[in-house]
Amino acid sequence: INCGDAGQEGELIQRWVMQKAGARCPVKRLWISSLTEEAIREGFAKLRDASDFQPLYEAGLSRAIGDWLLGMNATRLYTMKYGQNRQVLSIGRVQTPTLALIVNRQLEIQNFVPKQYWELKTVYRDTTFSAILRKSEEELVLEAEKQKEAIAAGKKPKKEEENRGIDPITDRERGLALLDQIKNSPFTVTDVTKKEGREAPLRLFDLTSLQVECNKKFAYSADETLKIIQSLYEKKVATYPRVDTTYLSDDIYPKCPGILKGLRDYETFTAPLTGTALLKSKKVFDNSKVTDHHAIIPTGQHPQNLTDMERRVFDLIARRFIAVFYPDCKFATTTVLGEVESIEFKATGKQILEPGWRVIFGTPSVQSQEEKEEKGEEENVLPAFVKGESGPRVP
């Protein structure tokens, strides 16, 4: 029985071992996604023919041969052509493109030219509004003409700016003049719009997304996270780690109540799900999105003797799993436009209507920290504004 790691590389390694040993006997394959006693017994009860995995073996073999040929030949070529002082320039299918991404990013950072600018803000009813200074039609036409001329001259066109048409304050004197222009003038609300939205639960983890999350939250390296999740797998509390899908197969759904029941440390969140039919979303359960293994989830075994680092990673996995059975988070986005002396101002706020799955994480925000940083906006609950209202403001 081939009991190798249930994956492409595990299949390849075991085939090589059997070939070297000269094995000629019939072979069955044990294929499991967790090391719990229940999963192992089920796997042995459903042993599969080795021939079912012939394409997987051939895929692994092709990968190994391709990496060997590329590494052997390209490393020699680049070492002889560009190596200095007996330096070896290693070339690889994955490492070289990854290095290129890092180099390109570093060049972008080095070539970035910061530009100083100012923002005009005002506070009305304890809410901060930011000025929206728009470019004139003549300025927009002139920019478009310059862009066309640059393209005609063979220059690389500029990236489309997210705030195209907005005129930033790049001159301090202009900013002070605008501030003086609105001095002592009242603020008038010109428009109020409210839009309700829904946010689905976060997807389950594959290996890459887990590594990214652990790096953001705990500053763990990709290798550290891999070692931790491998340890959790060997301790039978998490499923197979080296996966590239965020979905579960349909046959996992009947097992989910038992897995949730086993998460005793999270009873506060699993209790509302007990005794009810669990949600079965296509964003979670989809056979067409599952190949060798499903997403990383808890096995239902109670975790014991975990290190602090292991407990942190397990907590991420457990909470993600519980959250997919909770309803969507419902929120409302409110945008308020105002005006002071013909200068337009804007404020945006979001409010949680029904937290849904977000109660699992204890985070009322409907926007990730990364989104906040990218958009440069803070989420805040706005007071009730009425179109046409007017009043004093500061400064």
What are these regions (language model features)?
Residues 1-395:
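Toprim catalytic domain recognition across nucleic-acid enzymes
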